[in-house]
Amino acid sequence: MTAKFRILVLNGPNLNLLGKREPGIYGAATLDDIVGRLQQLAAELDVELTHKQSNAEYELVDTIHQAMGTVDFILINPAAFTHTSVAIRDALLGVAIPFIEIHLSNVHAREPFRHHSFLSDVAKGVICGLGADGYEFALTAAVRHLERSSNN
């Protein structure tokens, strides 16, 4: 049976170090833990979920381009690229796939340079400060958005 929706999860630089890097800020869960929980939830929701993590901006841009016509929604934690990447913003706008921006920490309670996002104003929504649970909330919200859109 074909999945109801296809959702792409993108994770940016240094997220491969989750569980080791600053656990007081980012939590103890590894990226594999987070993606595993997401895969379980996706199966329950009848969603096909694919994941990519990269420390290279161009790889994330290429993956976004390749998603056109094959993905219904994107969940993205751009990490440090949040504050610097016009290229990722333009790629997301170019493919016109709705997306939710995710951050493990509350970026607004951190250093001032982390307060600006190049993506937030064009995202369907932003989830920050809820740790690894934010990914699951984002997946659930994406599915609800897609269900509402397909019923109209």
UniProtKB/Swiss-Prot annotation:
GO terms for molecular function: 3-dehydroquinate dehydratase activity. The record marks 21 as: Transition state stabilizer. Substrate binds at residues 77, 83, 90, 104-105, 114. One of its GO terms (biological process) is aromatic amino acid family biosynthetic process. It comes from the Bacteria. It catalyses: 3-dehydroquinate = 3-dehydroshikimate + H2O. The keyword Amino-acid biosynthesis applies. Gene3D superfamilies: Dehydroquinase, class II. Keywords: Amino-acid biosynthesis, Aromatic amino acid biosynthesis, Lyase. The keyword Lyase applies. It holds the Pfam family DHquinase_II. Its EC number is 4.2.1.10. The active site is at residues 26, 103. It is an enzyme of class 4 (lyase). Pathway: Metabolic intermediate biosynthesis; chorismate biosynthesis; chorismate from D-erythrose 4-phosphate and phosphoenolpyruvate: step 3/7. SUPFAM superfamilies: Type II 3-dehydroquinate dehydratase. Belongs to the type-II 3-dehydroquinase family. Homododecamer. PANTHER family: CATABOLIC 3-DEHYDROQUINASE. Catalyzes a trans-dehydration via an enolate intermediate. This is 3-dehydroquinate dehydratase. It comes from Tolumonas auensis (strain DSM 9187 / NBRC 110442 / TA 4).
